[in-house]
Amino acid sequence: AHSDAEAKWSKSLPFAMWKQSASLAASLAQAIDDSPEFHGIAVTMTGELADCFSTRAHGVACILEQVTRVFPAPLVYVYCVDGNWRSPSQAARDPWIAAASNWHALANWSRRFLPKPRVKDQEAQGVLVDIGSTTIDVIRLAANGVKTASKTDSDRLKRRELIYTGIERSNLCGLVRSVPLHGKRCPLMNEQFATTRDAYLWLGFLDECPEDKDTADSQPATREHARFRLARIVGEDGSTLADSDIDAIGQCVMNQQVKLLRKSLEKVLGKVPGDRQVSHIISSGHGGFLLRQTLEDGSLAQRFGLQEQIWLEDRLGQEHSRSAPAYAVSQLAAENLQV
Protein backbone atom coordinates (compact mmCIF):
# COMPACT_ATOMS: atom_id res chain seq x y z
CA ALA A 1 0.00 0.00 0.00
CA HIS A 2 1.15 3.57 -0.70
CA SER A 3 1.04 6.26 1.99
CA ASP A 4 -0.18 8.98 -0.40
CA ALA A 5 -3.95 9.11 0.06
CA GLU A 6 -4.31 10.71 -3.35
CA ALA A 7 -2.55 7.76 -4.97
CA LYS A 8 -5.23 5.36 -3.73
CA TRP A 9 -2.89 2.44 -4.40
CA SER A 10 -3.07 -0.85 -2.54
CA LYS A 11 -2.52 -4.32 -3.87
CA SER A 12 -3.13 -7.71 -2.30
CA LEU A 13 -1.61 -10.82 -3.89
CA PRO A 14 -1.94 -14.42 -2.66
CA PHE A 15 1.35 -16.06 -1.75
CA ALA A 16 1.77 -19.64 -0.47
CA MET A 17 4.67 -18.98 1.89
CA TRP A 18 4.80 -22.60 3.08
CA LYS A 19 5.31 -23.79 -0.50
CA GLN A 20 7.49 -21.14 -2.13
CA SER A 21 9.18 -18.92 0.45
CA ALA A 22 12.26 -18.59 -1.78
CA SER A 23 10.10 -16.83 -4.38
CA LEU A 24 8.89 -14.06 -2.08
CA ALA A 25 11.27 -11.49 -3.58
CA ALA A 26 9.90 -12.14 -7.07
CA SER A 27 6.34 -11.76 -5.80
CA LEU A 28 7.19 -8.48 -4.07
CA ALA A 29 8.80 -7.17 -7.25
CA GLN A 30 5.64 -8.08 -9.15
CA ALA A 31 3.47 -6.41 -6.52
CA ILE A 32 5.11 -3.00 -6.98
CA ASP A 33 5.34 -3.04 -10.78
CA ASP A 34 2.58 -0.42 -11.04
CA SER A 35 3.08 1.42 -7.74
CA PRO A 36 3.47 5.20 -7.49
CA GLU A 37 6.94 6.55 -6.73
CA PHE A 38 8.14 5.83 -3.19
CA HIS A 39 11.13 6.81 -1.04
CA GLY A 40 11.07 4.13 1.63
CA ILE A 41 9.59 0.74 2.46
CA ALA A 42 7.64 0.12 5.67
CA VAL A 43 7.43 -3.59 6.49
CA THR A 44 5.03 -5.45 8.72
CA MET A 45 4.95 -9.18 8.49
CA THR A 46 3.01 -12.34 8.99
CA GLY A 47 3.95 -15.74 7.63
CA GLU A 48 7.11 -16.27 9.68
CA LEU A 49 5.37 -19.19 11.41
CA ALA A 50 4.92 -21.12 8.14
CA ASP A 51 6.17 -24.68 8.52
CA CYS A 52 8.79 -24.24 5.81
CA PHE A 53 10.79 -22.39 8.49
CA SER A 54 12.42 -24.32 11.33
CA THR A 55 11.77 -21.57 13.89
CA ARG A 56 10.07 -18.21 14.03
CA ALA A 57 13.50 -16.53 14.09
CA HIS A 58 14.37 -18.42 10.90
CA GLY A 59 11.13 -17.21 9.33
CA VAL A 60 11.74 -13.57 10.22
CA ALA A 61 15.31 -13.73 8.89
CA CYS A 62 14.24 -15.38 5.63
CA ILE A 63 11.41 -12.91 5.01
CA LEU A 64 13.67 -9.92 5.64
CA GLU A 65 16.37 -11.39 3.42
CA GLN A 66 13.83 -11.69 0.61
CA VAL A 67 12.61 -8.13 1.20
CA THR A 68 16.13 -6.70 0.98
CA ARG A 69 16.73 -8.52 -2.29
CA VAL A 70 14.14 -6.19 -3.81
CA PHE A 71 14.62 -3.04 -1.73
CA PRO A 72 17.97 -1.65 -0.48
CA ALA A 73 18.25 -2.24 3.27
CA PRO A 74 18.72 1.49 4.13
CA LEU A 75 15.25 2.16 2.66
CA VAL A 76 13.55 -0.57 4.72
CA TYR A 77 11.88 0.13 8.08
CA VAL A 78 10.44 -2.83 10.01
CA TYR A 79 7.45 -2.19 12.28
CA CYS A 80 7.57 -4.10 15.58
CA VAL A 81 4.96 -5.04 18.19
CA ASP A 82 6.30 -2.46 20.64
CA GLY A 83 5.24 0.25 18.18
CA ASN A 84 8.82 1.11 17.22
CA TRP A 85 10.77 0.76 13.99
CA ARG A 86 13.92 -1.24 13.37
CA SER A 87 16.29 -1.82 10.49
CA PRO A 88 16.21 -5.27 8.85
CA SER A 89 19.39 -6.32 10.67
CA GLN A 90 18.04 -5.12 14.04
CA ALA A 91 14.74 -6.92 13.46
CA ALA A 92 16.53 -10.15 12.51
CA ARG A 93 18.48 -9.98 15.80
CA ASP A 94 15.26 -9.51 17.81
CA PRO A 95 12.81 -11.65 15.82
CA TRP A 96 10.05 -12.07 18.38
CA ILE A 97 9.38 -8.35 18.44
CA ALA A 98 9.25 -8.15 14.64
CA ALA A 99 7.22 -11.32 14.06
CA ALA A 100 3.48 -11.08 13.35
CA SER A 101 3.42 -7.32 13.89
CA ASN A 102 0.67 -6.63 11.34
CA TRP A 103 -2.18 -6.63 13.85
CA HIS A 104 -0.42 -4.11 16.11
CA ALA A 105 0.32 -1.75 13.22
CA LEU A 106 -3.33 -1.75 12.19
CA ALA A 107 -4.58 -1.26 15.75
CA ASN A 108 -2.07 1.53 16.40
CA TRP A 109 -3.08 3.39 13.25
CA SER A 110 -6.83 2.82 13.82
CA ARG A 111 -6.75 4.83 17.06
CA ARG A 112 -7.22 7.98 14.97
CA PHE A 113 -10.86 7.10 14.41
CA LEU A 114 -11.61 7.46 18.12
CA PRO A 115 -12.79 10.89 19.35
CA LYS A 116 -10.41 13.04 21.36
CA PRO A 117 -11.12 12.91 25.12
CA ARG A 118 -13.11 15.83 26.49
CA VAL A 119 -12.11 15.09 30.07
CA LYS A 120 -8.60 14.13 31.20
CA ASP A 121 -8.17 10.40 31.92
CA GLN A 122 -11.42 9.57 30.12
CA GLU A 123 -10.08 8.67 26.71
CA ALA A 124 -12.41 7.02 24.22
CA GLN A 125 -12.28 3.23 24.04
CA GLY A 126 -12.69 1.14 20.91
CA VAL A 127 -12.26 -2.34 19.52
CA LEU A 128 -10.75 -3.25 16.16
CA VAL A 129 -12.09 -6.30 14.31
CA ASP A 130 -10.01 -7.33 11.29
CA ILE A 131 -11.46 -10.30 9.41
CA GLY A 132 -9.31 -11.84 6.71
CA SER A 133 -8.95 -15.03 4.74
CA THR A 134 -7.30 -17.01 7.55
CA THR A 135 -7.74 -15.25 10.89
CA ILE A 136 -9.76 -12.71 12.84
CA ASP A 137 -8.12 -10.10 15.09
CA VAL A 138 -10.09 -8.55 17.95
CA ILE A 139 -8.00 -5.82 19.60
CA ARG A 140 -9.06 -3.28 22.21
CA LEU A 141 -7.64 0.20 21.76
CA ALA A 142 -7.96 3.71 23.10
CA ALA A 143 -6.99 7.15 21.90
CA ASN A 144 -3.72 6.86 23.84
CA GLY A 145 -2.63 3.37 22.81
CA VAL A 146 -3.29 -0.26 21.96
CA LYS A 147 -4.87 -1.83 25.05
CA THR A 148 -3.42 -5.31 25.21
CA ALA A 149 -0.43 -6.88 26.90
CA SER A 150 -0.16 -9.43 24.08
CA LYS A 151 3.03 -9.52 22.05
CA THR A 152 2.85 -12.91 20.33
CA ASP A 153 0.21 -14.94 18.52
CA SER A 154 0.04 -17.41 21.40
CA ASP A 155 -0.59 -14.51 23.81
CA ARG A 156 -3.46 -13.37 21.63
CA LEU A 157 -4.91 -16.85 21.20
CA LYS A 158 -5.08 -17.28 24.98
CA ARG A 159 -6.80 -13.90 25.38
CA ARG A 160 -9.26 -14.57 22.51
CA GLU A 161 -7.80 -11.61 20.62
CA LEU A 162 -6.84 -13.92 17.77
CA ILE A 163 -9.36 -16.36 16.32
CA TYR A 164 -7.72 -18.79 13.96
CA THR A 165 -10.56 -18.91 11.48
CA GLY A 166 -11.15 -16.79 8.39
CA ILE A 167 -13.52 -16.39 5.50
CA GLU A 168 -11.52 -18.26 2.85
CA ARG A 169 -8.83 -20.71 3.93
CA SER A 170 -10.32 -22.40 7.00
CA ASN A 171 -10.99 -26.12 6.65
CA LEU A 172 -14.66 -26.81 7.38
CA CYS A 173 -14.09 -30.04 9.31
CA GLY A 174 -11.95 -28.04 11.74
CA LEU A 175 -14.73 -25.52 12.23
CA VAL A 176 -17.95 -27.53 12.59
CA ARG A 177 -18.47 -31.16 13.60
CA SER A 178 -21.79 -31.67 11.82
CA VAL A 179 -24.25 -29.85 9.56
CA PRO A 180 -27.99 -30.20 8.95
CA LEU A 181 -28.88 -32.58 6.13
CA HIS A 182 -32.36 -33.86 5.30
CA GLY A 183 -33.71 -33.10 8.77
CA LYS A 184 -30.84 -34.67 10.71
CA ARG A 185 -27.31 -33.74 11.76
CA CYS A 186 -24.64 -35.23 9.52
CA PRO A 187 -21.02 -35.41 10.72
CA LEU A 188 -18.42 -33.98 8.35
CA MET A 189 -15.79 -36.06 6.63
CA ASN A 190 -12.37 -35.26 8.06
CA GLU A 191 -10.90 -34.32 4.68
CA GLN A 192 -9.80 -31.11 2.99
CA PHE A 193 -12.85 -31.21 0.73
CA ALA A 194 -14.04 -27.62 1.25
CA THR A 195 -13.13 -24.36 2.97
CA THR A 196 -14.98 -21.35 4.29
CA ARG A 197 -14.47 -19.67 0.94
CA ASP A 198 -16.85 -22.22 -0.58
CA ALA A 199 -19.52 -21.44 1.99
CA TYR A 200 -19.35 -17.73 1.24
CA LEU A 201 -19.10 -18.20 -2.52
CA TRP A 202 -22.30 -20.20 -2.32
CA LEU A 203 -24.06 -17.75 0.01
CA GLY A 204 -23.03 -14.81 -2.19
CA PHE A 205 -20.79 -12.98 0.29
CA LEU A 206 -17.64 -13.51 -1.81
CA ASP A 207 -17.27 -12.77 -5.51
CA GLU A 208 -16.54 -15.55 -7.96
CA CYS A 209 -13.03 -15.71 -9.43
CA PRO A 210 -13.02 -18.32 -12.23
CA GLU A 211 -9.30 -17.94 -12.93
CA ASP A 212 -8.41 -18.70 -9.29
CA LYS A 213 -7.95 -22.42 -8.67
CA ASP A 214 -6.44 -22.18 -5.18
CA THR A 215 -9.27 -24.31 -3.81
CA ALA A 216 -9.61 -27.67 -2.09
CA ASP A 217 -10.04 -29.56 -5.39
CA SER A 218 -7.99 -27.17 -7.56
CA GLN A 219 -11.12 -26.27 -9.50
CA PRO A 220 -12.27 -22.67 -10.10
CA ALA A 221 -13.45 -20.45 -7.25
CA THR A 222 -17.00 -20.24 -8.56
CA ARG A 223 -20.37 -20.80 -6.94
CA GLU A 224 -21.08 -23.93 -8.99
CA HIS A 225 -17.77 -25.58 -8.10
CA ALA A 226 -18.26 -24.54 -4.47
CA ARG A 227 -21.52 -26.49 -4.54
CA PHE A 228 -19.65 -29.72 -5.33
CA ARG A 229 -16.94 -29.06 -2.76
CA LEU A 230 -19.51 -28.43 -0.02
CA ALA A 231 -21.46 -31.56 -0.96
CA ARG A 232 -18.37 -33.75 -0.63
CA ILE A 233 -17.91 -32.99 3.06
CA VAL A 234 -21.12 -34.91 3.79
CA GLY A 235 -20.37 -37.75 1.39
CA GLU A 236 -22.56 -36.44 -1.43
CA ASP A 237 -21.88 -34.54 -4.61
CA GLY A 238 -23.32 -31.49 -6.27
CA SER A 239 -25.78 -33.49 -8.34
CA THR A 240 -27.38 -35.29 -5.39
CA LEU A 241 -28.15 -32.33 -3.13
CA ALA A 242 -30.74 -29.60 -3.59
CA ASP A 243 -29.89 -25.90 -3.36
CA SER A 244 -31.59 -25.82 0.03
CA ASP A 245 -29.22 -28.52 1.31
CA ILE A 246 -26.16 -26.52 0.23
CA ASP A 247 -27.74 -23.38 1.72
CA ALA A 248 -28.04 -25.15 5.08
CA ILE A 249 -24.40 -26.27 5.03
CA GLY A 250 -23.19 -22.77 4.18
CA GLN A 251 -25.39 -21.13 6.80
CA CYS A 252 -24.19 -23.58 9.46
CA VAL A 253 -20.59 -22.58 8.70
CA MET A 254 -21.44 -18.90 8.95
CA ASN A 255 -23.35 -19.38 12.21
CA GLN A 256 -20.33 -21.08 13.78
CA GLN A 257 -17.96 -18.28 12.80
CA VAL A 258 -20.43 -15.69 14.11
CA LYS A 259 -20.55 -17.64 17.38
CA LEU A 260 -16.75 -17.65 17.67
CA LEU A 261 -16.54 -13.92 16.92
CA ARG A 262 -19.26 -13.13 19.45
CA LYS A 263 -17.43 -15.08 22.17
CA SER A 264 -14.20 -13.25 21.37
CA LEU A 265 -15.87 -9.85 21.49
CA GLU A 266 -17.51 -10.70 24.82
CA LYS A 267 -14.14 -11.75 26.24
CA VAL A 268 -12.22 -8.70 24.98
CA LEU A 269 -14.94 -6.17 25.80
CA GLY A 270 -15.43 -7.75 29.21
CA LYS A 271 -11.90 -6.65 30.18
CA VAL A 272 -12.76 -2.96 29.96
CA PRO A 273 -12.66 -1.27 33.41
CA GLY A 274 -16.10 -0.90 34.97
CA ASP A 275 -16.14 2.89 34.69
CA ARG A 276 -15.43 2.82 30.95
CA GLN A 277 -17.37 1.82 27.87
CA VAL A 278 -16.14 0.82 24.44
CA SER A 279 -17.99 3.30 22.28
CA HIS A 280 -16.56 2.49 18.84
CA ILE A 281 -16.10 -0.71 16.87
CA ILE A 282 -13.81 -0.50 13.84
CA SER A 283 -14.04 -3.07 11.05
CA SER A 284 -11.35 -3.87 8.48
CA GLY A 285 -10.56 -6.71 6.11
CA HIS A 286 -12.79 -8.23 3.45
CA GLY A 287 -14.87 -10.20 5.95
CA GLY A 288 -16.88 -7.30 7.32
CA PHE A 289 -20.09 -9.11 6.46
CA LEU A 290 -19.33 -11.55 9.30
CA LEU A 291 -19.13 -8.71 11.82
CA ARG A 292 -22.38 -7.24 10.49
CA GLN A 293 -24.07 -10.58 11.15
CA THR A 294 -22.58 -10.68 14.64
CA LEU A 295 -23.84 -7.19 15.50
CA GLU A 296 -27.18 -7.52 13.75
CA ASP A 297 -29.38 -8.26 16.77
CA GLY A 298 -27.98 -5.30 18.73
CA SER A 299 -27.33 -7.29 21.91
CA LEU A 300 -23.58 -6.66 21.99
CA ALA A 301 -24.07 -2.94 21.42
CA GLN A 302 -26.58 -2.76 24.24
CA ARG A 303 -24.53 -4.84 26.67
CA PHE A 304 -21.22 -3.04 26.14
CA GLY A 305 -22.34 0.45 25.15
CA LEU A 306 -21.20 0.36 21.53
CA GLN A 307 -22.38 3.58 19.92
CA GLU A 308 -20.65 3.82 16.56
CA GLN A 309 -19.57 1.36 13.89
CA ILE A 310 -16.72 2.43 11.62
CA TRP A 311 -16.24 0.43 8.43
CA LEU A 312 -12.83 1.02 6.86
CA GLU A 313 -14.15 -0.32 3.57
CA ASP A 314 -16.46 2.71 3.45
CA ARG A 315 -13.80 5.16 4.68
CA LEU A 316 -10.83 3.93 2.65
CA GLY A 317 -12.23 1.81 -0.17
CA GLN A 318 -12.25 -1.94 -0.65
CA GLU A 319 -8.60 -2.41 -1.62
CA HIS A 320 -7.16 -0.35 1.25
CA SER A 321 -9.45 -2.15 3.70
CA ARG A 322 -8.45 -5.58 2.43
CA SER A 323 -4.77 -4.61 2.71
CA ALA A 324 -5.38 -2.66 5.90
CA PRO A 325 -2.20 -3.61 7.84
CA ALA A 326 -0.04 -2.63 4.84
CA TYR A 327 -1.95 0.62 4.41
CA ALA A 328 -1.71 1.33 8.14
CA VAL A 329 2.05 0.77 8.30
CA SER A 330 2.60 3.00 5.27
CA GLN A 331 0.67 5.78 7.02
CA LEU A 332 2.53 5.31 10.30
CA ALA A 333 5.86 5.46 8.48
CA ALA A 334 4.92 8.62 6.60
CA GLU A 335 3.85 10.28 9.86
CA ASN A 336 6.66 9.14 12.15
CA LEU A 337 9.74 8.62 9.99
CA GLN A 338 11.74 10.92 7.76
CA VAL A 339 10.86 8.95 4.63
Enumerate the predicted regions with their spans.
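Residues immediately flanking
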Residues: I131
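Conserved Rossmann-like nucleotide-cofactor binding loop
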Residues: T134
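Nucleotide/phosphate-binding catalytic cleft detector across ATP-hydrolyzing
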Residues: S3-L128, I139-V339
